[in-house]
Amino acid sequence: MTGLLQKDFYNLRTAIKNLLLILVIFIAYLIFRKHEFILPLVPVLLSSSLLTTVINLDRHSKWNMLMITAPLQKSELVKEKYVLLMLLNVSGVLIGTIVSIPFIISGTMKLVSFIDMTVLGWSVALLQGTIFLTYTYLFDKNLLEKLEIMMLVSYVISFAIIISVYYLVPDIFGTKNHSLIITHIVIWAIILLTYFIFWKISVNKNMKSEQM
């Protein structure tokens, strides 16, 4: 799996440079507009979009066909993509944290706001990536021809689910004075569990297809 991760990060080197440039421009704009509280959200949200680049590169390089002759199982490739998603998300969180530290120290950004936006962004990115990988490895392979559309749809679904759950929390607990941080941490924990469940399902499905 280490070799597969190295391959993907090597293939992503140009895309990562371009993404970092976009981030710098985006961050500069947010600072100029005095919207520093959004800084933790942006890097982690963009991190999952790199999955499209990776899978596109695999498809165009005929990597899936090369795997037939390589000493690798398809299930290993699937497992590696889920690990890659988590690594990309963690990298996005770290970048958001590094960028936010000066504003937290100066008092421009509240620590509570930083934690809240970080957890919210990670929840959306992780759910989006999980939905995207589930589409890719569990359903019609013709969907691989529409990766960009799948990526956009998975973002929309992620935001719709998380925002809906957030607004349902006051009704469920009978209060409108619930904690945003606690709400987002609970949502993140549920999404993390969903991520591992679909990881297992995707790997098992591909293991069964290899045995047939």
Language-model segments: which ranges?
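Short helix-to-coil transition segments within interhelical loops
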Residues: 68-74
